[in-house]
Regions:
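Aromatic/hydrophobic pocket-lining residues that form π-stacking "cages" and hydrophobic walls in ligand
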Residues: 26, 85-86, 131
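Helix N-cap/beta->alpha junction signal
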Residues: 77-79, 124-125, 181
Length: 183
């Protein structure tokens, strides 16, 4: 019995279709088991059905924010169920997720922001300070930052909420309050 040559083996592999989205493929392959656990983290279990829903919603949200096909989205996120939903959601939207190690320095992230040309960053709340530092060091301007599992409580100088207090007035201005505001 003879072993097929590399050329013969390659010729027998079917070509990819003209349009192929790996995230859509992965979600479709697992559509028949929506209740099965896909990922588990310290906050709980994410089923395949929930992964499908979260990835599609995140992808739609990224597109609604104005991100376009093949633009980069930096994923500076701790391990957890938000990570695969974000990775697949970006891919589902036709974006390019850029996965990075969470143990690096602000200088490393500044370099990655500049060289990946990321238009958005999905960041774990605990890593937001290092991202902010990286963005001040980078010449590349990120358009959108989305925080996963933001940290609380807020610093006294941060606004907790805004409300427009006068309806239908051209002079309406938002009024905000933070922890140290008297009211």
């Amino acid at each position: 019995m003879t072993t097929p040559s590399a050329a013969e083996t390659l010729a027998s592999v079917p070509a990819l279709p003209d349009a192929f989205n790996y995230a859509a493929h992965l979600l479709a392959v697992n559509a028949g088991r929506p209740g099965k656990a896909a990922f588990v983290d310290d906050a709980g279990t994410l089923s395949y059905g929930e992964l499908d829903e979260r990835a599609r919603r995140l992808g739609a949200g990224l597109r609604l924010l104005g991100l376009k096909r093949e633009e980069r989205v930096l994923l500076l996120m701790h391990d957890g169920t938000d990570w695969p939903a974000s990775f697949l959601g970006a891919m589902y939207a036709g974006l390019v997720p850029v996965a990075v190690n969470t143990l690096l320095t602000a200088d490393d992230y500044a370099y990655m922001l500049e060289h990946s040309r990321a238009q958005a960053v999905l960041v774990s709340g605990a890593l937001l300070p290092v991202l902010n530092s990286a963005m001040t060091k980078s010449d590349h301007e990120v358009q959108k930052v989305i925080v996963s599992r933001p940290q609380a409580p807020l610093h006294p100088s941060e606004v907790e909420f805004e409300a427009f207090l006068k309806a239908y007035s051209p002079l309406t201005k938002p009024a905000g309050t933070g922890p140290d505001d008297p009211g």
